[in-house]
């Protein structure tokens, strides 16, 4: 179970968070961001699933929260539901840490968001599944500032 990348984009396609776990050139990254947004943005939340076949035997698992799309690219053989829950877990941690997280929190506190992301995902794999453990680590990091 390895991630290729994690993207958080708004409805307009602006990338608010990008973490790459596979080597891509800058041109490929720009192209992938556009392709992922064009793939997930027009999908109907009520009648279509949160899993989309992608290229090179991968798939996009995504979840929309308000105006943000949280997308992960995984191998086609990986368990989609595990990653869907991992996305939800990440958003729950963000929500608890920032207190009702919004897009502006991601923009202005990007360094904290990346720290949270690194606590949950490490080297493209799910590292921590305990919300309390992650929040305790983040409290310790906050005290260092």
Swiss-Prot record:
Pfam families membership: Clat_adaptor_s
The protein's matches in CDD domains, at most eight in alphabetical order, are given as: AP2_sigma
- According to UniProt, the name of this protein is AP-2 complex subunit sigma
Q: Enumerate the PANTHER family for this protein.
A: ADAPTOR COMPLEXES SMALL SUBUNIT FAMILY
* UniProt gene name: aps2
Q: Which cellular components does GO assign to this protein?
A: AP-2 adaptor complex; intracellular membrane-bounded organelle
**What are the protein's UniProt keywords?**
Cell membrane, Coated pit, Endocytosis, Membrane, Protein transport, Transport
User: Subunit info?
Assistant: Adaptor protein complex 2 (AP-2) is a heterotetramer composed of two large adaptins (alpha-type subunit apl3 and beta-type subunit apl1), a medium chain (mu-type subunit apm4) and a small adaptin (sigma-type subunit aps2).
Q: Which GO terms describe its biological process?
A: clathrin-dependent endocytosis; protein transport; vesicle-mediated transport
């Amino acid at each position: 179970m390895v991630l290729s990348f994690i993207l958080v984009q708004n409805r307009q396609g602006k990338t608010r968070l990008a973490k790459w776990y596979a080597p891509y050139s800058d041109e490929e990254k720009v192209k992938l961001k556009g392709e992922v947004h064009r793939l997930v943005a027009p999908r109907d939340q009520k009648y279509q699933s949160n899993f989309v076949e992608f290229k090179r035997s991968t798939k996009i698992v995504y979840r929309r929260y308000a105006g943000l799309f949280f997308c992960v690219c995984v191998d086609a053989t990986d368990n989609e539901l595990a990653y869907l829950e991992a996305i939800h877990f990440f958003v729950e941690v963000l929500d608890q840490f920032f207190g009702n997280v919004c897009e502006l929190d991601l923009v202005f506190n990007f360094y904290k968001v990346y720290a949270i992301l690194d606590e949950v995902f490490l080297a493209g794999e799910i590292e921590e599944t305990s919300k309390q453990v992650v929040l305790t680590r983040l409290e310790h990091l906050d005290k260092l500032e």
